[in-house]
Each structure stands twice: as C-alpha cells, then as structure tokens.
Amino acid sequence: MSGRVGDLSPKQKEALAKFRENVQDVLPALPNPDDYFLLRWLRARNFNLQKSEAMLRKHVEFRKQKDIDNIMSWQPPEVVQQYLSGGMCGYDLEGSPIWYDIIGPLDAKGLLLSASKQDLFKTKMRDCELLLQECVRQTEKMGKKIEATTLIYDCEGLGLKHLWKPAVEAYGEFLCMFEENYPETLKRLFIVKAPKLFPVAYNLVKPFLSEDTRKKIQVLGANWKEVLLKYISPDQLPVEYGGTMTDPDGNPKCKSKINYGGDIPKKYYVRDQVKQQYEHSVQISRGSSHQVEYEILFPGCVLRWQFMSDGSDIGFGIFLKTKVGERQRAGEMREVLPSQRYNAHLVPEDGSLTCSDPGIYVLRFDNTYSFIHAKKVSFTVEVLLPDKALEEKMQQLGAVTPK
C-alpha cells in the first residue's frame, strides 16, 4: 500500500489514528492538519510513529521560530528579488504546480556577498510556502487533492563557479531544511540540459537528499522536450521548454513568472568575503615555495581550492607531474594553471579546475620572488568526484550538453 489516503493497509490506518492522537496538542498550530498532511510525515519516516512525531514537533518549532505563518507578507531584499533565479510557471497534467530552477545564470557568490544567508533561506522558505498555497488553490479548483509539485532544473551553463564551497554548503543547508520541513511535497524533479560537470555537482549535494527524493530525480537526455510534454500540456509549458506558453508580450521564456538571474553588480555587495575555515596552514620561507600533491585517478574529477595569505601576496599555480615518485621543479612539470601572484592577504582566493587527464597534480604556493618576507598561507584543497552511476546514465542517454 502506498500510504496515501484511500490506499492504506489496516496497520497504516491504525498508525494514522494513533499519530493524530499523539500530536493533537500541536495540530491547532498547523495550517491544514488533515489526513493528507499527517500521512506526509508518516511516509517520510516509514510509518515509524516515534520518528514521525519527533519530525512534526520539530517542524512546529521551526514554524514558530521562522514566523512561517506570516512569511508571505515579507518581501525579500531587492538584490534577492532581482537575481535569485527560478519561479512558478504552469501546471502538470495532474494539476500540480511547476517550479523552475535556472542554474546557469545564478550568481551564487554574488548573492552570498550581497545578502545574508538568513534572507536567502527565508526567500526559499517563502517559495516552499507559495507552492503549498498553490496546491491548496489547485485542490479547490480541481476538486481533488493536490499536495506535491513538479520541479524542472535547467542546468545549462552549470559551471565551476557553481561549485564554490560556501555556495554548495549553503545549498546543502537549504536542502536539509526542505527535507525536514516539507516532506513528500516533491512529486518529481526533471534535470534538463545537464553538462558533463553535473555528476560532480550532484555528488556534492547527494548526501543532503533522502533516498526517496533521489528516486524522484529524472535526468533527461537530448529528447527532454518530448519527455516533458508527456507530463505537461503544451499550453502549460513555456516555448523555451518545448511548449506553447508565452508571456503576454510574446516572450518565449515567460520572464514575468520565471526569474533568469544574472551576474550581480558589485554595487549590491555588502561584504568582500565569506568567512571560511581552512584545513591546513604553512609557513613558506622567503625565496621558497610549497607544493601539495593530489592524485587524480580518472578524467572528470574537479580540484577545488581556497587559500589566504598573511600580510602580503602569494603566488599560486597548478602543475601536472611528468615523473612520478620524485619532487620536480615548476619548470620540469606541465603547467595546467599558470602561476601568478594573488592579493590573498586582502581577499581570500578560491577556484576550481576540471582535470582532463589522470596523474599527480601539484598545487604550488610560490614565494620565490620575496627576498625579505616569509609568508603564512592557510588553505583547503579537495578532490571532487563525479557520481559514476549518474555519469554512465548520462552517457547512455546522450544527456550531456557540450559545456
């Protein structure tokens, strides 16, 4: 049995009655605590009464702390309204609202430098509540229960800039919040126009997703427009995504409903860096350099780094060893990222690199040009691996876009 209204086993019916009894003290604090609502929490915890109750009580506290009942009257800051991409547009064939997330033009670093993380989270909570309210309206309009949404992730333009560690960590926090407070509200999630980098990005956020959510993700291949039309009527799908819907002015992207983001002008910045913890610290003598080695076993892995120097600038470059098992000078190795000097004492430096060849990669901090000062450098380096199963599936589908 699915554990949904009208499809409950005797055991599940008994669990529902017991659950309602156990949590009756908090039900008045919830917007619409019908059987559909309570079953969402039970399904999310496999009908384990103790875990379901703990989850729901935690959610009630979350609603109080975040003042969720009044969140729709709150307006996000201007920069978030203008540049946080995404939006609700149309309904699928069953009447569920559709939400689009537009990844490519999203300036994640710009948002975190221009707005507080709290305001960004609050905006996403507001979006979740907006979708739930739309489900209620659709339920009344269609005369049947609508309680979940369809998501479309447009991944065209997903690049290394989106792997910036603070941005990935912030997105992970949001996913945890979503899983804990909006269970069973996702019907399906379509990934369209996924580039080669997508399996690496997915592997970073996968730990934050429940097994149930992972099962609802469908990565579509080159025929993604045809697939979407199996679930969505053409008049409910923007022309941009293979349908016939346009804005009143004829815009095929339906920009009145979907925000396409963009690079954030620096005039909006309220800080020049996001605080980070570094895993390593090293003192580099004057006229010297420091090398750290990372073995890359197969193509498609990503090296991601952050570093800061103390008091003065530092040189940084990446090389690929031509001889394994011995230290090589910079001139003896293959240059992958040209060495240059960075003012990492003023603003921490970060970056990432897709490794096209296997081998030993050397990240070299260069202080050879300094005849007087030693430099203290703090840094974190990680090797990001692709989700191999997803990578293989994308290759079979022909899902990969060139970039």
From Swiss-Prot:
InterPro entries: CRAL-TRIO_dom, CRAL-TRIO_dom_sf, CRAL/TRIO_N_dom, CRAL/TRIO_N_dom_sf, GOLD_dom, GOLD_dom_sf, SEC14/CRAL-TRIO_domain. SUPFAM superfamilies: CRAL/TRIO domain (SSF52087), CRAL/TRIO N-terminal domain (SSF46938), Supernatant protein factor (SPF), C-terminal domain (SSF101576). The modification N6-succinyllysine is found at K11, K51, K253, K257, K393. The keyword rRNA-binding does not apply. CDD domains: SEC14. Keywords: Activator, Cytoplasm, Lipid-binding, Nucleus, Transcription, Transcription regulation, Transport. GO terms for molecular function: lipid binding. Residues 275-383 form the GOLD domain. Carrier protein. Binds to some hydrophobic molecules and promotes their transfer between the different cellular sites. Binds with high affinity to alpha-tocopherol. Also binds with a weaker affinity to other tocopherols and to tocotrienols. May have a transcriptional activatory activity via its association with alpha-tocopherol. Probably recognizes and binds some squalene structure, suggesting that it may regulate cholesterol biosynthesis by increasing the transfer of squalene to a metabolic active pool in the cell. Monomer. This is SEC14-like protein 2. It comes from Bos taurus (Bovine). The gene is SEC14L2.
